[in-house]
């Protein structure tokens, strides 16, 4: 998992040749912290096929307006420069362990769907 800043956002996310899953978070958000370990495990599972990243909205508040982020954690998927907010389930189900399997299912069915055909 990489840390994205406004300085490297364009290069790391928008210009990426591989799909990116970006978590918008803040240091004081316990749910965001819980997703860090999920993102690390997902990165290990999928390797170089996907880029998992996080951006701290406290350090980069401008990003909230750019992507119309209302709260954290928010997860967006970027493919070929296009952004889509991930329609993940509401807490607490998502954060009680269900989240990791949901993200794997999403990655497999939406991001790598052509690889399975």
Locate each region found by the language model.
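Structural micro-motif
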Residues: 67-79
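Substrate-binding pocket helix/loop in short-chain dehydrogenase/reductase
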Residues: 9
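Short cysteine clusters
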Residues: 29-32
């Amino acid at each position: 998992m990489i840390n994205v800043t406004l300085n490297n956002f364009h290069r790391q996310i928008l210009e990426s040749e591989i799909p990116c899953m970006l978590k918008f978070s803040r240091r004081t958000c316990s749910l965001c912290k819980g997703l860090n370990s999920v993102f690390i495990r997902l990165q290990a599972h999928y390797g170089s096929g996907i880029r998992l990243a996080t951006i701290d909205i406290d350090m980069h508040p401008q990003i909230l307006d750019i992507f119309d982020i209302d709260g954290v954690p928010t997860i967006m998927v970027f493919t070929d420069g296009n952004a889509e907010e991930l329609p993940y389930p509401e807490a607490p189900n998502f954060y009680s362990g269900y989240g990791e399997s949901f993200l794997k299912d999403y990655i497999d069915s939406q991001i790598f769907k052509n690889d399975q055909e």
